Amino acid sequence: MRTWAEWDDAVPGFVEIDLVGHEGGNSRGEFCFTLDVTDIATGWTETRSVRNKAQKWVFAAIKDATAAFPFAILGIDSDNGSEFINRELLTWCEQENLTFTRSRSGNKNDGAHVEQKNWHIVRQTVGYHRYDTAAELDLLNRIWALQRLLTNHFGPQQKLLAKVRTGAKISKTYDRPATPFQRVLADTGTVSRDVKKRLRRENKPLNPAAIQRQIQALSAELLTLTTAKQGTKPQPAIRAKPNDSTKQPQRAS
């Protein structure tokens, strides 16, 4: 794959991308997926949900998400799924002079940054339910429009600076916690002053508690929709307590 810029995790603009499936334990039929796009240097993350993982939906979501970053995207790293490894995305990366790399087959640590966001943002916010309707898709994206504000402006993160093994013990050193917003403002070589001014204006009126309440309200609405599809489920059998059973256990003589 064409390399337009040397991959540099310390520079804003190099992102990892990944999909999270919302099959709810049932992989049959069509269901929604959520795309996470995470900048390695700053932790800035944009999230978009799509109706399924067809290339055209995923590609459109990638373009929309990367356009929302407060700095230019320089490189994209994905796993080996066909929703990412295809001619359309590669051609676009070449046209935009984006370095496009993919993880090594069988190496689960290559996408560690974005996979952490899959759990912290997607699973902790909307859980493991099955989402497969247009109404649910709309709610998911309304949630992400709010969640991005919490994650990027108010979610402090720590970055690993060093890892030292001494015998069986591993010692890790982290930097001071900082939000993606703060890391973008601290950048001295990539992000322009105008962008930083715009981000400060965007940040000033934000109320994280109010945003969280809005997310909770939308999440409750989403849960109502998905549970309504399931109908009334039989209650699981409850094992009788020893004193409630019809025949008391006896000790063998």
Positions of the model-derived regions?
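Mobile genetic element proteins and their domesticated derivatives, centered on retroelements
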Residues: D18, V37, G43, I62, ...
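Protein C-terminal end segments and domain termini
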Residues: I143, Y174-V184, D194-S253
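Charged, gly/pro-enriched flexible loop segments at helix/strand junctions
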Residues: A145-Q182
